[in-house]
């Protein structure tokens, strides 16, 4: 059954096939599909950021993740029953020549997996984009869906795992397979990057790992994650920030000022 997109009104099935008019869908009907880790290694080997995004959004290399993301897209949360679900891997998004990279964990099952854009359509994203707007890095404080007019200024967001995982916990094998997309995307934008904000310990580990694999020297002993933690890797400053999950924001472990402070430091790096 096809349902109307909340912004454009165009109707889509769930999951959304590529090249059918979803806002900002980078893939075409001819975009090659990865069915294995070896395929990911081969298809991530491109010098085009747009093509990398396209290829990553049709990836089917991890059977458990494919099954889960599509199961959620078909079943839908009751509050979103009238909307189509993207139900595919979620690409990096934002400025193509970013000053700041924001690295998270994975799309939320009913957030990015529904909207097709990282940190969009869930409480974590509400918190994150409000902060980016307050410090002058986003043109609006809200993110509801792809095509909603949101723009980032000098910022790009990437999830180390591009599919929504069951219980928000990817396996080591899934993480390692998806790291090939991550590594290439970081390589393609690294020349302009001066700060990386890692949202949570998983993101901190992923950030240090991909920067190291892209030629930057990771300090020894390896820097530990903490809110406000800072590590210098060549021309890049890595900053730690608690993940803006409800577990952290509802309890006061992460406040608006704490979040804003990290993004101000990243902005000024």
Go through the PLM ranges and name each one.
Residues 3-269:
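A polyanion-binding, active-site-adjacent surface
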